[in-house]
From Swiss-Prot:
PANTHER family: PROFILIN (PTHR11604:SF0)
Function: Binds to actin and affects the structure of the cytoskeleton. At high concentrations, profilin prevents the polymerization of actin, whereas it enhances it at low concentrations. By binding to PIP2, it inhibits the formation of IP3 and DG.
Predominant localisation class: cytoplasm
SMART domains: PROF
CC per GO annotation: cell cortex; ciliary plasm; cytoplasm; cytoskeleton; nuclear lumen
Superkingdom of the source species: Eukaryota
Subcellular location: Cytoplasm, Cytoskeleton
Family listed: Belongs to the profilin family.
Database matches in InterPro entries: PFN (IPR048278), PFN_euk (IPR005455), PFN_sf (IPR036140), Profilin_CS (IPR027310)
Organism: Trypanosoma brucei brucei
Keywords of the record: Actin-binding, Cytoplasm, Cytoskeleton
GO MF annotations in UniProt: actin binding; actin monomer binding
Transmembrane segments: none
Protein name: Profilin
Amino acid sequence: MSWQSYVDDSLVGSGFMHSAAIVGLADGSYWAYGGTYVPQPEEVTHILKCLENFSLVQSSGVTICGVKFFGLQSGSEGQMKYIFFKKGAAGGCIYTSKQTAIIAVYGNPGDASALQQDLQKTEATYVAVNPADCNTTVKRIAEYLISLDY
């Protein structure tokens, strides 16, 4: 399976997130990505710093595609590190494997625009997602990659 297939089929394709990226822990390079909210290179650099120093998550949050999320929780579990973040009804998570960080976003971080769409009688483009479904899906991919020494 290609790295892009992990994003297209297993992450975004799960329906539990609308955007995802897999980046290298060593250098922040993009291995694969898809969706609307993909972190920009300087945002990936900050995310990697947050994974090394969890206090940054609480003090500065996480920014993805220019949207600032506040950090809910961060820590380590076995060989994985994780960060959970939120903004309004939107949010996401980051899990690491041995060589990658998997970044996922669900919901619409611009809640006001979703409300505006509703007022204009147009359909909102993001479906409500249970955050636990997003987190569990990303965690399982990270665990699988760890089992393959990635």
